[in-house]
């Protein structure tokens, strides 16, 4: 039914299972939750699959805003729509995204930014439109996460935070494009604009870091250094284009010195993909004088201030931050999905585990122990 129809039928409250975080760092609990109808300009989605991102893990370990339903990398099918929604209808396949695109604010109409002023990253655990929740347990509110909350069989998102996708695209694969893989590719392509023959160093070889490597490889980078403390990442990283692996725990001298020696004076581009402000400084020290660019993608759990000597900038280096790799979700994700469907980019290789939704705590353990890239959780059919 079209939202413009005079016979618009208001959806009702439904109940479903959701993995709820009650206490920081403790196992999620499968609970029956009430999911309110979508309000104006919102849609309710039947989640088909969702993947665990390190941001979920970090927030779960430190988050005081509880109870909460985490999850923000997700794909599903529109179950119902709120008033005023014209872009979607019941049955559409969609990706949910943590940063939206209203299409009319200063940033959305600019070609320079994807930082929507209306539907930017939501940090209060509420919906953008009315600062309320759509989840409850026995009448008591349950907080959202990044305005997505995909660790639930059903969720409600603003229509500006959803992207309609080709129904032929496999949802259990492309769900990774709603955060990590897209963020890494975009950092290499949109933010750094890595050039053919350049040298790149990546700090942190999780899904985001390896996506940066894939993007750099596809751009023709000649040297891609990967820095991590997990030796198991060395062989895995080659698949995505890393030419040299550096275990920072094995070094007897400062990392920047090693990288400058390996690159002949410093990398053209460095990427901080851990979420550690100290590593951001190290990344800045590791890139070349004159033109070296450091791009930060990680979200720090603590100490958000970056400390760097002013001389690093006087020498011509630059530091840039990015959220979601600079992609405007509605405008750009469909073409990224096309690249996957045409086998121009890799997604499957990031999926190390496929688990049922009730195995969600196993996914958290695997990520906490560094034994996975992406665990895709499949909802009951």
Swiss-Prot record:
Any single GO CC term annotated in Swiss-Prot or TrEMBL for this entry: cytoplasm
Cofactor mode of binding and number, as noted: Binds 2 Zn(2+) ions per subunit.
GO molecular function, one term: alcohol dehydrogenase (NAD+) activity
Keywords of this entry: Cytoplasm, Metal-binding, NAD, Oxidoreductase, Zinc
Catalytic reaction annotation: a primary alcohol + NAD(+) = an aldehyde + NADH + H(+); a secondary alcohol + NAD(+) = a ketone + NADH + H(+)
Binding site for Zn(2+) 1: 53, 55, 72, 179
Binding locations of NAD(+): 55, 204-209, 228, 233, 297-299, 324, 374
Positions bound to Zn(2+) 2: 102, 105, 108, 116
InterPro entries per record: ADH-like_C (IPR013149), ADH-like_N (IPR013154), ADH_Zn_CS (IPR002328), GroES-like_sf (IPR011032), NAD(P)-bd_dom_sf (IPR036291), PKS_ER (IPR020843)
Protein's cellular compartments: Cytoplasm
The organism's place on the tree of life at top rank: Eukaryota
Assembly mode: Homodimer.
UniProt protein name: Alcohol dehydrogenase-like 6
Organism encoding this protein: Arabidopsis thaliana
Organism taxonomic ancestry: Eukaryota, Viridiplantae, Streptophyta, Embryophyta, Tracheophyta
